[in-house]
Amino acid sequence: MIRKVFFALVGCLLLGQSAQAALDIVITGGIDSARPIAVAPFKWEGNGQLPQDIAEVVSNDLMRSGKFKPLARGQMPQTPSTSGEINFAPWASQGVEAVVVGSIAAVGDGTYKINFELVDVLKGQLAKAQGGESNGYILDSRMATIPGAQMRQFAHRISDIVYERLTGERGAFLTRLAYVSVQQGTQFPYQLRIADYDGYNEKTLLRSREPLMSPAWSPDGSKLAYVSFENQKSEIYVQDIYTQQRSLITSFRGINGAPEWSPDGRRLAIVLSKDGSPNLYVVDVASKQLTRVTTSRVIDTEPSWMPDGQNLLFTSERGGKPQIYSVNLATGMTRRMTWEGESNQGASITPDGKIMVMVTRVQGQYRIARQDMENNALLVLTQSALDESPSVAPNGSMIIYATIYQGRKSLALVSTDGRFKAVLPTSSGEIRAPAWSPFLN
């Protein structure tokens, strides 16, 4: 897998278009181990049809996190819209730990007022039994007035709040995915796309007749770096996802590949073969100043930044087979990081620096694995035959990767503890090279 040959000829097109739910999510494992929760339908205080089923979005978000098992609406003992309407006993009898309730009201000019509360069922049951006036069982309560066009995004915001209050970790539902869609037999078979993490609000940033590869998000979520072959060779570009403006970063002879943003957003770690074997370089995005990092005679590739911004992880064949190494940018000192498995490659670190995620080869099959950075314990997370391109959510809880599902290259999810698994099948073509965005405001 490490020795990829690149070919290209001509043609690309910049554009922006939207679509709905281009990616569906099919749960394949792990939901039975999740915590039971309920998201009651939000009360609609208006005329006509509810503009957005916020409760459904929140429920699906929490389910996809792998940490929660939302109660089906048909199993709910009641449909309260405020904490005061909750009868805690029947919820507790079903094992529900917390309930989300809320309401939506139209306020004119296409705007809506949304109220919601997150309620602890056990604390509420105890408070009612003691006959007290305390509302300490209300874990969170908020109100916002928003445009109708932002209602789905606000639902993700509610999910983030609920997730953080119940787990102590920041939610990653207000995030995006970047990926390459391949539709062979069309005028522009390669398309660089972004979408909300759940597949909604998809936009195409670039259409090309030739391969597009390795999208990588800037730390502020406003730009993508990627590899394009539109000019008969590999080149690295940076493109603003809002203005569509892009700039050419490198166009050297040979390989220009694998861009990865530094934590400060000023530099890219890249792979160049302009002087022979593929080696690691760092390029300043503004000045284009280039600094060589490794001088190996074998393949060094797939750089990834450590959270400190002073070290890189990378894949190298210097030991005979692909393994993960680290290199200090100041000293140039390298250290081998992986010793288990037939080979290991494509590593990245969770934001807290505690877990290294990578592709490991087990009995000839490529699977997603994690390695504890403290004790080096390796855990294989997937059981497929050809998994690749893992990208970690900004809160470190989930990994998105490319796999083969029902004969097509698709995207899949696995939690970093391995308990939750899902696939994001595509109805046509293939999906490759996923990249999870940073947290977005």
Curated annotation (Swiss-Prot):
Localization terms from the record: Periplasm
Pfam family, one: TolB_N
GO cellular component assignments: periplasmic space
Signal peptide (UniProt feature, chain positions): 1-21
Cystine pairings recorded for this chain: none
Recorded coiled-coil stretches: none
Keyword RNA-binding: no
One GO process term, biological-process aspect: protein import
UniProt xrefs under Gene3D superfamilies: TolB, C-terminal domain, TolB, N-terminal domain
Keyword annotations: Cell cycle, Cell division, Periplasm, Signal
InterPro entries according to UniProt: 6-blade_b-propeller_TolB-like, PD40, Tol-Pal_TolB, TolB_N
Subcellular location, principal: periplasm
Family in the record: Belongs to the TolB family.
PANTHER family named among the record's database cross-references: PROTEIN TOLB (PTHR36842:SF1), PROTEIN TOLB HOMOLOG (PTHR36842)
Listed NCBIfam families: propeller_TolB
Subunit annotation: The Tol-Pal system is composed of five core proteins: the inner membrane proteins TolA, TolQ and TolR, the periplasmic protein TolB and the outer membrane protein Pal. They form a network linking the inner and outer membranes and the peptidoglycan layer.
Function: Part of the Tol-Pal system, which plays a role in outer membrane invagination during cell division and is important for maintaining outer membrane integrity.
Protein known as: Tol-Pal system protein TolB
